[in-house]
Amino acid sequence: MKMKKSLVALCLTAGLFASVPGISLAEVNYVPQNTSAAPVIPAAALQQLTWTPVDQSKTQSTQLATGGQRLDVAGITGPVAAYSVPANIGELTLTLTSEVNKQASVFAPNVLILDQNMTPSAFFPSSYFTYQQPGVMSADRLEGVMRLTPALGQQKLYVLVFTTEKDLQQTTTLLDPAKAYAKGVGNSIPDIPDPVARHTTDGVVKLKVKTNSSSSVLVGPLFGSSGTGPVTVGNTAAPVAAPAPVAPKKSEPMLNDTESYFNKAIKDAVAKGDVDKALKLLDEAERLGSTSARSTFISSVKGKG
């Protein structure tokens, strides 16, 4: 028995460092396999959840307000998202994203990984999911990458996403759109305050599954067990079909400082005779919700700016 425990510990330690992306070894200050900080969830409560299967073919998206589930357990606040992932396709890379919405709020996710017997195997607290700045194809978001190695014989893993009362007391500082734009085009970064997103129980979380060949967190017992077989978990839901595309909603009005930044940049571009740049600034400002950029552009071109 001592030999078995030592071998398991060795596998878990070897997988730790690859499970925390983008940090040095000196910065590792928690162990994903240590699930003692995770809420204790009775097996009966887990079996009542509907676990949505996720495979490599697409990203699974859940709107918590409408697609989340209730789990009345101490340490969990608001709706949860529950997914099942195939464990017989090799090592896995799970990317979980929580998008910041237009009201400047965001769901701060915690993730509990369970093996096919519904035994907690890894815990990733909300601090693991860090703020990522918006890009060409992505919005402001909290995001984390989890690399997992299912033990031999595991058929599926379970991924439970939730938030806590402690998370709701915290906030996330975002990057102001004007700063993001200036950074993207190589302009000087304006000295304006960044918006702050409050943490809520609502939001959109997305889970993407890929196979992975690097070291990772071992999930499930390494050796055979005389225990009971896999637990049948409620009714496994079919993957939810993606909704039909809808026309994008009109952007929320931008902050005064952001509006002023774009208006000044438009005036400066017109004054220098760079109308193309002014038009690009106008398009970007209106995309972000500006209500005065167009009139600023017109008056500047007419010599009234």
From Swiss-Prot:
Not yet known. Might function in the uptake of a still unidentified substrate. Its main location: periplasm. It comes from Salmonella typhimurium (strain LT2 / SGSC1412 / ATCC 700720). To E.coli MalM. GO terms for cellular component: periplasmic space. The keyword Transport applies. Residues 1-22 form the signal peptide. Keywords: Periplasm, Signal, Sugar transport, Transport. The keyword Signal applies. This is Maltose operon periplasmic protein. InterPro entries: MalM (IPR010794).
